Amino acid sequence: MQGLAGSVRVAALDIDGTLTERRGAARLDGCSIAVARLLNDLGVTSILMTGNSLPVARGVAVYLGLEGPVVAENGCVAVVGGERVHICSGRPPEGLVKRIMELGFKPSWQNEYRYHEYSLIPVKAAPGIVERASAIAEEEGYRAIWSGYALHIQPPGGGKARGVGEVLARIGAGWSEVLAIGDGENDVEVLARAGYSGAPGDAAEQAKRAAKIVARSPGARGTLEIIQRVLGGARAPAC
């Protein structure tokens, strides 16, 4: 999989665990800047795909210097060419959210800025808590997605693959032209569909199995490693 710079038009990148220092960390790695500059230098369109709220995702894109589309809330909302696109409709009902919170979750501060998803943080680790939350959500026709950082409750019709697919259609690109990199269970569908895909070295096992390349390094350093490998050893700024 060497020397494919001409075949890759789009890089779809997760944020947390992919541009941060490692999986579970919230601090951006200095290598994330090198990733952004390398993609810009190569003329590859970036798509940030994240479970974060849209303001957070757009803020990360702006400060990294990535001018491509943004997919937020695990595919429920996107910004393409300055236009906000809603892929999901509505929000989970308060009663459902309350039932799931009673398992041992608390609200994320980002919920105030979300259009469709509701995000919950585990109060403490408890075996089977995510599986029980998913079962409750499914009973009422909703999805509960674990990102490695939070539990995301979303209406039907979401998912990162759905959001990225909507963006690709709008920019005239196909899945075969995409290099996707992600570390979480919520990235698996995109990793499986993309023509080229990778996971940082400390990614979730589901992501590693779905990816075509698994980096040696964690977090953003692993992401940079994957990009350089797929794009023929392209040189990146030091980080």
From Swiss-Prot:
Swiss-Prot/TrEMBL keywords: Carbohydrate metabolism, Hydrolase, Magnesium, Metal-binding
Top-level enzyme category: hydrolase
Pfam family of the protein (one): Hydrolase_3
GO cellular component term of the entry, any: cytosol
Annotated GO MF terms: magnesium ion binding; phosphoglycolate phosphatase activity
InterPro entries noted in UniProt: HAD-like_sf, HAD_sf, PGPase
Keyword Ion transport tagged: no
CDD domains: HAD_Pase
Residues that, per the record, bind Mg(2+): 14, 16, 183, 187
Catalytic reaction equation(s): 2-phosphoglycolate + H2O = glycolate + phosphate
Co-factor requirement: Mg(2+)
Catalytic center residues: 14 (nucleophile)
Residues annotated for substrate binding in this entry: 160
Record EC number: 3.1.3.18
SUPFAM superfamilies, per the entry: HAD-like
Lineage top rank: taxon: Archaea
PANTHER family with a match to the protein in the record: HAD SUPERFAMILY HYDROLASE-LIKE, TYPE 3 (PTHR10000:SF8), PHOSPHOSERINE PHOSPHATASE (PTHR10000)
Family: Belongs to the archaeal SPP-like hydrolase family.
Function: Catalyzes the dephosphorylation of 2-phosphoglycolate.
NCBIfam families: Pglycolate_arch
Identification of the protein by name: Phosphoglycolate phosphatase
Source organism of the structure: Aeropyrum pernix (strain ATCC 700893 / DSM 11879 / JCM 9820 / NBRC 100138 / K1)
Lineage of origin: Archaea, Thermoproteota, Thermoprotei, Desulfurococcales, Desulfurococcaceae
